[in-house]
C-alpha cells in the first residue's frame, strides 16, 4: 500500500535557485513522499520578501518596506497592485512545472495549493470569472504530471469572499478540466 507522508513548504518554488536546490536535496534525503505548496505567492511573517515571479502580468504593491513586524498591515486591497487577471505570466507557470518535474524525479507528490488567504497582491479577491480562468489554465498546465494533487485552498474558511458554493464550483471546474482525475482536497483553518 501507499502511505502519503507529507510536509508543507508554502512557497519553496518561488524562492531563489539556490534555496530551491537546497529544498530538493533536503527532500531527497527525507522520509517525505508528498509536499504541499502554492501557485500564488504568500505574504506571511516568514514569507515577507517578494517572490521570484508572479502569476499575472502587471505590477505588485511596493514591498520594500515590509518586515516581519508589519507584514500584517498589507492585504489584498493594498495600494499599488496593478494586475491584468486575464494575462498569465507563462514564466511563472513554467517554473512551477519545472519544480513539479523535479519532485516527480524524486518520487514526491506535488500537492498544489490553488488559493490561500495570506495575500497582499489581490489574488485572493479576484472575480469569479477570473478564478475560473485561473483554475482552467492551471489544470491545463499541470494536470499532465502524474504526481499532481489538487488542494483547492489552504485555510479556505479564512478566505471570506468565497462561499461553500464557490468552493464546490471550483472543484467542479477542476474535475472537468483535469482529464487524469488527480486527487483533490481542501484544508480548513478555523472550522
Task: List each language-model region with its residue ranges.
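Active-site mouth of glycoside hydrolases
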Residues: 2-191
Amino acid at each position: 500500500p501507499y502511505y502519503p507522508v507529507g510536509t508543507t513548504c508554502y512557497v519553496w518554488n518561488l524562492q531563489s535557485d539556490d534555496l530551491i536546490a537546497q529544498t530538493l536535496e533536503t527532500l531527497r534525503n527525507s522520509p517525505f513522499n508528498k509536499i504541499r505548496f502554492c501557485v500564488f505567492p504568500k505574504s506571511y511573517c516568514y514569507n515577507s520578501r517578494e517572490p521570484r515571479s508572479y502569476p499575472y502580468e502587471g505590477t505588485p504593491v511596493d514591498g520594500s518596506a515590509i518586515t516581519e513586524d508589519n507584514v500584517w498591515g498589507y492585504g489584498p486591497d493594498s495600494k499599488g497592485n496593478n494586475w491584468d487577471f486575464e494575462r498569465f505570466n507563462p514564466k511563472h507557470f513554467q517554473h512551477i512545472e519545472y519544480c513539479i518535474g523535479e519532485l516527480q524525479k524524486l518520487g514526491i507528490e506535488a500537492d498544489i495549493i490553488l488559493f490561500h488567504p495570506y495575500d497582499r497582491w489581490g489574488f485572493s479577491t479576484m472575480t469569479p470569472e477570473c478564478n475560473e480562468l485561473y483554475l482552467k489554465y492551471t489544470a491545463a498546465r499541470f494536470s499532465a504530471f502524474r504526481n499532481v494533487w489538487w488542494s483547492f485552498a489552504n485555510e479556505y474558511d479564512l478566505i471570506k469572499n468565497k462561499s461553500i458554493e464557490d468552493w464546490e464550483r471550483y472543484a467542479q471546474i477542476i474535475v472537468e478540466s483535469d482529464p487524469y482525475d488527480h486527487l483533490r482536497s481542501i484544508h480548513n483553518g478555523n472550522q
